[in-house]
Amino acid sequence: MVEYDYEQINKQELIWEDNNMSRLGMLYALNEEDVKKLRSVPEEERYEYMLEEIEEALIGSPRSCELDKAWEGIQYCLGGGQWNEDNCIPTNIVFGGEVLVETDDEIITLKNHQDVRDIVEYLHQNKLQEIIQKNFWNIDDENFMYKNDDGLEHTLGWS
């Protein structure tokens, strides 16, 4: 189980990035300067900037959270077993927020301070692992290739 410093994260903005080619997901807590720099980069260059500047600086630090391939199962489980890309914070931790990059292969979304506070409060009130255990087997088999015992353990292990 991943441990988070919710008080510190609550003061930051979160950025979600996903490279659909490898299907790996990351969350980063950005300060205002990080967000300002990211927004100043042209949209078509933001993903590369995120990889080269933000990820390079933050990966492995307390300001990063790797979700590996578990992000997809988490997304389904937070939606009760259904895929939900509606911009509904706090239950759409993965895709909710402002879209900064969206292509066929990559997506970056930004959660503002209030979104982060709402997510933190939601996770304090609702145990993510319990949500996953409750909803994992409700995921449609046709849409989720990891719906098996190993997929459940992987999703729980990264949550």
Predicted regions and their residues:
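Acidic (Asp/Glu-rich) sequence patches and key acidic residues
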Residues: 2-158
